[in-house]
């Protein structure tokens, strides 16, 4: 099997941070070479843009925000993702372009056609081989975000914003079931872990 590009995504409060540890443990048990990274971020340029994008004080228009996301992504692809895959290393990214369709598209209202243009220009033919989409009901997401001590620029948004974000995620998953695995992360930790491990086992033929 060629090196796999796997993404982990979902609305805020879906449990990505917790379940990244599950994925790391799965790769470690099998001794598979893997690189973990994140978006926006993963490179010095990406991390600098991340600080701007998540800072509640940042006043950026929708197009500027979207372009910053893709600027960080282009650097990420060129400096991190493609080199790792070329070296035979699997890559797991905490968020990727699905998040742009969901947050800037669904949440903010950026036309999906415009995002697709940037997607093709920045990524070429690069697409994830597998996307683990963590999903929780809106009220669970909002409750978990509410427990965050300091909310970032996106976490400060209202429920209707996250409702639109979640809808885009689920619609994209329904339209391409061969790439997406929707994980109910409102279940107990053990159940969520088992679900993720089963998806990875199946994907890698374990």
UniProtKB/Swiss-Prot annotation:
According to its UniProt record, the EC number is: 2.7.4.9
Where on the tree of life does the source sit, at the highest rank?
Answer: Bacteria
Binding residues for ATP, per the UniProt record? 10-17
Q: Which reaction does it catalyse?
A: dTMP + ATP = dTDP + ADP
GO molecular function, one example?
Answer: dTMP kinase activity
Name the keywords, alphabetized: ATP-binding, Kinase, Nucleotide biosynthesis, Nucleotide-binding, Transferase
Q: Name one GO cellular component term.
A: cytosol
Top EC category? transferase
Coiled-coil annotated residue ranges, if any: none
Q: Which GO terms describe its biological process?
A: dTDP biosynthetic process; dTTP biosynthetic process; dUDP biosynthetic process
Sum up the protein's function in the record's words: Phosphorylation of dTMP to form dTDP in both de novo and salvage pathways of dTTP synthesis.
Q: Mind telling me which NCBIfam families this protein's record contains?
A: DTMP_kinase
The UniProt entry's sequence similarity note says:
Belongs to the thymidylate kinase family.
User: What is the protein's name according to its record?
Assistant: Thymidylate kinase
What organism does the record attribute this protein to?
Neisseria meningitidis serogroup A / serotype 4A (strain DSM 15465 / Z2491)
Q: What is the lineage of its organism?
A: Bacteria, Pseudomonadati, Pseudomonadota, Betaproteobacteria, Neisseriales
């Amino acid at each position: 099997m060629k090196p796999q590009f796997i993404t982990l995504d979902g609305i805020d409060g879906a449990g990505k941070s917790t379940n990244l540890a599950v994925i790391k443990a799965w790769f470690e048990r099998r001794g598979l070479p893997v690189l973990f990274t994140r978006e926006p971020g993963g490179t010095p340029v990406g991390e600098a843009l991340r600080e701007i994008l998540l800072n509640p004080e940042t006043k950026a228009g929708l197009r500027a925000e979207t372009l910053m996301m893709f600027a960080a992504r282009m650097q990420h692809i060129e400096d991190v993702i493609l080199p790792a895959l070329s070296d035979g290393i699997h890559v797991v990214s905490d968020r990727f372009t699905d998040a742009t369709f969901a947050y800037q598209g669904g949440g903010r209202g950026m036309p999906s056609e415009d995002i697709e243009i940037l997607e093709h220009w920045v990524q070429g033919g690069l697409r994830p081989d597998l996307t683990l989409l963590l999903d929780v009901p809106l009220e669970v997401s909002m409750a978990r975000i509410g427990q965050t001590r300091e909310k970032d620029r996106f976490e400060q948004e209202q429920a209707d914003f996250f409702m639109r974000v979640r809808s885009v995620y689920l619609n994209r998953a329904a339209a391409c079931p061969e790439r997406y695995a929707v994980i109910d992360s409102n279940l107990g930790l053990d159940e969520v872990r088992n679900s993720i491990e089963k998806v990875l086992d199946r994907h890698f033929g374990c």
